[in-house]
Amino acid sequence: MQVSRTGIANVVCSFCLFSILFIESTVSAQGLIAPNRQLDPEAGMSAILLGTGIPLPQADRASACNALIAGDRVFLVDTGRNCVLRVREAGLTDLNGIFYTHYHSDHFIGLGEILLNYGVAGLDKSIPVEGPVGAKEMVDGMLANYSLDVSYRIAHHGDKFSTAIMNPTVTESRPGVIFDEDGLTITMFPVCHEPIAPAVGYRFEYKDQTVVFSGDTNVCPAFAEGARDADLLVSEVSNQAIWDRALSMARAANNQRQVEMIQEGLEYHAESLALARMAQEVGVKKLALTHFFPSFPPTEQAEANFIRGMSDFYDGPIVVGRDGMEVAP
């Protein structure tokens, strides 16, 4: 029996198409690819906790990354490891800007992946990137790392690959109002993460709502002032009681290095009970926790253990963040 080349090509093509459709349908059915999010320009604000983890890798927690949605505008606050996966799962197909709180790598390491994937998807614009002093050095380093990759994609795809996306518009700012446009005001404020400086948080105000992102900080007057009267405070948090047990084990093992590393980490993170007291004192209406130190599995039992005692000092709702969780003020 003779089969024409055209016939073979048609069979192969049909098989390939079937395979692609099968893969896409399987992935979608498993919830790995979300439909593109439809944004309502008349809506208020919400925060998506895209990455709730810390530098140590954890399968179910990306490192620091949040999205702020204000009407039909989308901003990211930090872009940690695997943030690009959570952005895709959230169906965020466009970005209006990226803000950085500081330059620990677990807060920015995902920037290149995010820009590259938007470029491959065809988003053809330069995305504004803003942060405290150091933003330009960080972005320049990322662009240097991606220079070969970008040159290959341009050689291969030409103008089908967006070069604008890989050239973000970078602004270094000092605390104060850094954005005021179409009813949305964004204020950068200092926080306390020494010896890391500068380190900042962000306050978003839109349609009579206020959403605040702490960045990395201990509980201090500057953080308290930045969070004052927030409808929603998205804050990092540490748990002293859990770390006290870890310190006891490290001392029992005569592991002085581990003891000092834990103590140094506790110095510049927001202890849970102190955070609860602060939130109550400054009138925070809802508290959403992220960037857990130490991290833990996203189970109800582990979550209850981590926030034990916080409601003794704070009478508002406490949301224990999981990756992909959306929180409204």
PLM region spans:
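Bacterial N-terminal signal peptides that target proteins for export
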Residues: 1-15
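Bacterial N-terminal signal peptides
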Residues: 12-24
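Signal peptide processing junction and immediate N-terminal pro/mature segment
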Residues: 24-31
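Core dinuclear metal-dependent hydrolase active-site scaffold
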Residues: 31-92, 166-228, 323-329
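Non-globular, low-confidence helical/coil segments that flank catalytic cores
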Residues: 47, 127, 138-144, 320, ...
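Active-site metal-binding motif and surrounding structural segment of the metallo-beta-lactamase
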Residues: 73-74, 81-130, 229, 233
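Acidic/polar short surface loop at catalytic or gating sites that assists cofactor/ion binding
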Residues: 132-170, 251-255
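Cap/insert and terminal regions of metallo-dependent hydrolase folds
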Residues: 201, 210, 218-322
